[in-house]
């Protein structure tokens, strides 16, 4: 088999791996959709759990990796660029729940005022008529009282419906914002999986499995608020699917079309910006939504469980795939750096260092690289 044929096979494998990794986001959405009993309390725990996963990814994986590669100052600059960028994006996401609530309140208040004025007017007219007929006055008063009670019941029902619609609109906007953040996060992940798979399946497969593992709770974070707000399984699944498909799209756009522009510095800058996006999304969208349905203590507990889950998923995957370390693993580790587009491999940066010194650094570095 020629080198060109081998390269073409690796490209096909890389694209398939990116597609499978992206589909795991939809798996998280399916889990939420097919839970038999939906409750707001469960939604609060799911949002808190997903917040913990995203915080852990940002501060224990993406940002440390970028700091190591492009420096503390540059990584932090791009981190805050990501925050500003996502804050601007959120301005275009509908958040009309507050306005809706105020508007409904205003309409309700105006309606009540008009009704009161109309009622007073009727009473004046009735008083004039009642001078001639006292019996009719009593009957009309009773009728007016019944009409007021019926009108009040209608207002209460309308107010309840408006309140529910306001809450549903809020949850829907949270889901859309989360989908945008996850989509932006999946673009560089697709590039990472693609480049790693070009180096070989022994490098690409562990990375794909690792990214797929943390895409599942991300899918849950997208689907939970949308499904709770709309009740539409298809809409919740659709947003998860679109978010996940950003991985193969990212691989195609950045890995194939703009391959020559994807420098190590640019990739690490993108990952630092993604860390900022995810942190801001947690602070601005996920946690405030979670606090509406669970207490702060309950939210904190689920948040920490999410971090622990992600921590163990990393080590479980590394224990199941030991060939990525030691011996051939050193070579694989070097490839993994290349796969992420990093600016150095151990053979280059440590030049005269012994093979043993490379092996010592491999497990720690690869644990950071696995989810970049």
UniProtKB/Swiss-Prot annotation:
Give GO terms: molecular function aspect only: zinc ion transmembrane transporter activity
Compositional bias per record (Polar residues), positions renumbered to this chain: 360-372
User: What highest taxon heads this organism's lineage?
Assistant: Eukaryota
Its placement in the membrane is given as:
Multi-pass membrane protein
One GO location term (cellular component)? membrane
Renumbered residue ranges of the record's region Disordered? 99-166, 328-372
Which Pfam families does the annotation name? Zip
Name the Gene Ontology biological process terms: zinc ion transmembrane transport
> Where does the sequence pass through the membrane?
15-35, 42-62, 70-90, 170-192, 207-229, 237-257, 271-291, 301-321
Q: Which UniProt keywords apply?
A: Coiled coil, Ion transport, Membrane, Transmembrane, Transmembrane helix, Transport
What are the Basic residues biased-composition ranges?
137-146, 334-352
Annotated coiled-coil segments of the chain: 133-167
Q: Cite the record's Low complexity compositional bias ranges.
A: 147-159
The protein's location, in the record's own words, is: Membrane
For this chain, the family text in UniProt reads: Belongs to the ZIP transporter (TC 2.A.5) family. ZupT subfamily.
Q: What does this protein do?
A: May transport divalent cations. May participate, with dstA, in the regulation of the differentiation of stalk cells during development.
Protein's recorded name: Protein zntB
């Amino acid at each position: 088999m020629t080198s060109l044929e081998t390269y073409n096979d690796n490209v096909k494998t890389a694209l398939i791996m990116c597609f499978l990794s992206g589909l795991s986001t939809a798996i998280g959405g399916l889990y939420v959709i097919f839970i038999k009993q939906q409750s707001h309390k469960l939604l609060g725990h799911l949002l808190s759990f997903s917040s913990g996963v995203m915080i852990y990814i940002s501060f224990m994986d993406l940002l440390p990796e970028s700091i190591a590669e492009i420096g503390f100052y540059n990584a932090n600059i791009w981190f805050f660029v990501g925050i500003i960028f996502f804050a601007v994006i959120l301005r275009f996401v509908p958040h009309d729940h507050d306005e809706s609530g105020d508007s409904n309140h205003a309409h309700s208040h105006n309606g009540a005022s008009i009704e009161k004025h109309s009622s007073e007017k009727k009473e004046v007219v009735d008083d004039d008529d009642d001078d001639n007929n006292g019996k009719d006055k009593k009957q009309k008063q009773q009728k007016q009282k019944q009409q007021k009670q019926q009108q009040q019941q209608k207002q209460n029902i309308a107010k309840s419906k408006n309140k529910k619609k306001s809450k549903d609109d809020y949850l829907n906007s949270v889901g859309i914002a989360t989908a945008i953040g996850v989509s932006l996060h999946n673009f560089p992940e697709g590039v990472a999986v693609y480049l790693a798979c070009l180096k070989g399946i022994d490098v690409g497969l562990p990375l794909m499995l690792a990214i797929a593992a943390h895409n599942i709770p991300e899918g849950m974070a997208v689907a939970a608020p949308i499904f709770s707000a709309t009740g539409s399984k298809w809409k919740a699944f659709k947003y998860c699917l679109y978010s996940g498909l950003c991985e193969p799209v990212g691989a195609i756009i950045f890995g194939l079309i703009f391959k020559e522009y994807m420098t190590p510095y640019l990739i690490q800058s993108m990952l630092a910006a993604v860390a900022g996006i995810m942190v801001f999304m947690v602070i601005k969208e996920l946690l405030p939504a979670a606090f509406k349905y669970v207490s702060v203590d309950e939210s904190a507990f689920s948040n920490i469980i999410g971090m622990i889950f992600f921590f163990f998923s990393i080590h479980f995957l590394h224990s199941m795939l030991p060939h990525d370390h030691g011996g051939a693993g050193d070579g694989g580790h070097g490839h993994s750096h290349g796969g992420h587009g990093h600016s150095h491999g151990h053979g280059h940066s440590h030049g005269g260092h012994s093979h043993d010194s490379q092996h010592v650094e491999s497990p720690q570095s690869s644990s950071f690289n696995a989810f970049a």
